Each structure stands twice: as C-alpha cells, then as structure tokens.
C-alpha cells in the first residue's frame, strides 16, 4: 500500500515509520528540506524509556522517503492527514495531485470537525477517521521520544459504513499491527473519538491558560472543577449527536491513564500558547463543543469562555506582557539536575538564546548530555524549564 503522510511532525513521522515497518510504502511530506533529508538518511529513530530505572528501548534508524511537496509523486492508495486542524484544507489542496478517485483519506488529528473539511473535496466513501493512544516528541531532527498507552494504540472507522470500507480498514489495521503496535478498525468510532475529545478538553486548553503541566493542573481543585464543568457540557452535546458517553467511566478509567502519561508534560495546546506562539486547535476541541452545542440548542458557557480566552491569546501573542527584568541577562542562573535529566534535548531546541547546548558524547542513558554554554545570555524566559518533561531544569534570579 502506497501511503503519504501530510504533516510529518512528531506524531505524523512516528505513525509513518510504524506503517513502513508494517510493510507499507510510505512517503513523508514535510515543510523543511533539512528535516526531509534527515528522514531519508540516516532515518527515523524511535526511542522510549521503560521501567523504573529509565531503561531505553530504541527502534531504528528507519530510512524513509520524504519530500517537501507533492511534485513528482505518484497517486497514493492512502493519505494520512496529521497536520493541525487549522491547516487541513490547505494541506489537502497542496496534495491534490496525489489524491485520486479511489485514494483513501485517513485523519487521526485531534478533535472533531476535520472530516467535514475533508469532505469538501473528497468523496465521503473514502474518508476514515479515528484517534491514537500514543505520544511523540521530536527531540532532535528525525529522533522521536515516544510512548504507547491504552489497550489499542490506533483506532479508526469510516464516515460511510460498508463492506468496502471494512475491507480497507482491516487491511490498514493489519499493517499497523504487523509493525508491533495495536490497531483496530471499528464501526463505533464516534464513541472512541468523543472519549479522546474529553481527554483533550480536560487538560489541553486549560493548561495553556494557567501555564501548568498536566499533572500540576490535575492536582489543583479549582482546575479539576473547571474541567468537570467542561466535560459535562461536552457529554451533553455528544448525546445530542447520538453518542452516549459515561462520565463516571471516563473519570475512573480513561482520565487517570491520560494524566499519568501526560503528567510531566505540557499538552500540545499549552506548547502552542506558551512556547511556540502558534495557532492552536481550539476550534476542533472546546470550540467544537461550543459550535455543536449552539446547533443543538445546548448551552456550553464554560467551553465557550475557554474558547474565547484562547482565541484572544492567539490574536495577541505579540502584545502579551513580558517582565522587563527578564532582559537583564546575567541576573538569571540555569541549573540542570543530572539526577533527573534524561537528555531528550528538548530544552536545547526551544532555548531562544542558545544558552544550552549538547556536550560531545552521550550521557549514562545513551542520550544527549546537556550543558549550560552561555549562562550570561539567559533572559529568564523559562522556555527550557517549561518544555522539560522531567522537571530537571530550574531558573533562579540572582541579586
């Protein structure tokens, strides 16, 4: 099966790598030429920490075909869409030459609403959608720190229910399963997608607004009450769409697992709002609940308020308050804990002043050794400590 991945960031390139391991002929489509070259040689490396002692498991390198545009590419059997929801329409327009009459389009993007955008240009019989129980961070070009959780790692269904759709769905799931992860095609996909939406509603936008990691926010009483209010609104809207969700089941079986896996991380929307200053997926998460609630005549005041706050932040990144003292440079000190640092390198990637760098060689875990190279250049922006998944970095202000 010839498959192209639109949006080969951390999640897209991980899924593409697994599809190739399962026997598919995969092409990754990325914006940056240098990243496409890294995907090709030496290839993608997927690594994860397992066990209490932080043992590392590693797959790869996996040489991948990659391109920055679709010129010269054949029509694909399938296209996996992994861009942000706000980029779905433009991504499909750019990929028009590789989408034929029988090409299947699969979206495993966050939230609800992407299938409607895809259906504007693609026959509904060829549209598949679902969600993933996986995580990935690209700590260096073509190097992924990954995690798998849940009983099934990739679950998806189709807009049109029929024998042809089931046949393709089972074939695609078989490719994923052959790679070593668990995948399934189901006709009850809306339940899975809505439960995943609840996970995102409970942590994503809220963490960005209060500037906390998932675990930190989840331990706060008022944040939890806010999340519960948003969840109850979403469940009411889901019922209006014919999807029956169990609040108690979600709170006792799904949310604890999600919090455990994301406790030390900033959710994707928080990263967009705090570090990247980038467009978020609010319209496909809380905004989707707001939009569908209006259509069904169901009030969603909490999700609406959160959506409005996020939109306000997005429109005004360049006007946000900044502590003027953060420009004094030498008055800030960066300290890295050797005990907690696992060497993912994410802090190096996001430091705007290149205060942090990698030493020659690897640390005891076989990862990057991070060091402070230019202490005096630190502006106290907290980007490094914000993105550190192990809370290994502290920034102190010196008198």
What are these regions (language model features)?
Residues 346-363, 383-399:
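Iron-sulfur cluster-binding cysteine motifs and their immediate structural context
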Residues 326-343, 360-380, 395-399:
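Ferredoxin-like iron-sulfur electron-transfer modules
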Residues 190-218, 222-235, 261-263:
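Active-site-proximal catalytic alpha-helix in oxidoreductases
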Residues 56-145:
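Rossmann-like NAD(P)(H) cofactor-binding subdomain of soluble oxidoreductases
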Residues 177, 226-329:
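NAD(P)-dependent Rossmann-like dehydrogenase/reductase catalytic/cofactor-binding core
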Residues 74, 110-192, 196, 202:
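Rossmann-fold dinucleotide-binding core
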Residues 1-56:
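NAD(P)+-binding Rossmann beta1-loop-alpha1 motif at the extreme N-terminus of oxidoreductases
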């Amino acid at each position: 099966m010839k498959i192209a991945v639109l949006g080969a960031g951390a999640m897209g390139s991980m899924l593409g790598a697994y599809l190739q391991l399962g026997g598919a002929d995969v092409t990754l489509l990325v914006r940056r030429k240098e990243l496409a070259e890294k995907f090709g040689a030496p290839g993608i490396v997927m690594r994860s920490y397992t066990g209490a002692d932080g043992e590392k498991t590693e797959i790869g390198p996996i040489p991948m075909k990659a391109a920055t545009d679709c010129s010269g590419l054949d029509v694909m059997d399938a296209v996996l869409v992994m861009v942000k929801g706000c980029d779905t329409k433009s991504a499909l327009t750019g990929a028009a030459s590789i989408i034929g009459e029988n090409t299947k389009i699969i979206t495993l993007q966050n939230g609800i609403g992407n299938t409607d955008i895809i259906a504007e240009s693609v026959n509904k019989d060829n549209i598949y959608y679902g969600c993933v129980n996986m995580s990935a961070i690209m700590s260096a070009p073509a190097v992924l720190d990954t995690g798998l959780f849940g009983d099934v790692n990739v679950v998806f269904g189709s807009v049109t229910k029929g024998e042809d759709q089931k046949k393709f769905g089972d074939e695609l799931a078989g490719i994923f399963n052959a790679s070593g992860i668990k995948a399934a095609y189901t006709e009850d996909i809306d339940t899975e997608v809505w439960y995943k939406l609840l996970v995102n509603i409970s942590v994503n936008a809220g963490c960005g607004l209060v500037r906390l990691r998932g675990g930190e926010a989840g331990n706060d009483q008022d944040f939890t009450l806010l999340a519960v209010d948003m969840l109850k609104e979403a469940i009411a809207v889901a019922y209006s769409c014919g999807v029956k969700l169990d609040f108690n089941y979600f709170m006792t079986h799904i949310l604890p697992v999600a919090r455990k896996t994301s406790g030390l991380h900033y959710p994707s929307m928080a990263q967009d709002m705090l570090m990247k200053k980038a467009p978020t997926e609010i319209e496909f998460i809380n905004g989707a609940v707001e939009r569908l609630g209006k259509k069904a005549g169901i009030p969603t005041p909490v999700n609406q308020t959160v959506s409005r706050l996020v939109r306000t932040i997005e429109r005004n990144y360049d006007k946000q308050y900044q502590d003027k003292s953060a420009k004094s440079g030498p008055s800030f000190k960066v300290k890295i804990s050797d005990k907690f640092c696992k060497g993912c390198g994410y802090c190096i990637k996001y430091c705007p002043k290149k205060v942090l760098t990698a030493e020659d060689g690897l640390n005891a875990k076989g990862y990057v050794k991070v060091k402070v190279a230019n202490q005096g250049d630190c502006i106290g922006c907290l980007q490094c400590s914000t993105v550190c998944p192990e809370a290994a970095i502290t920034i102190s202000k010196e008198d």
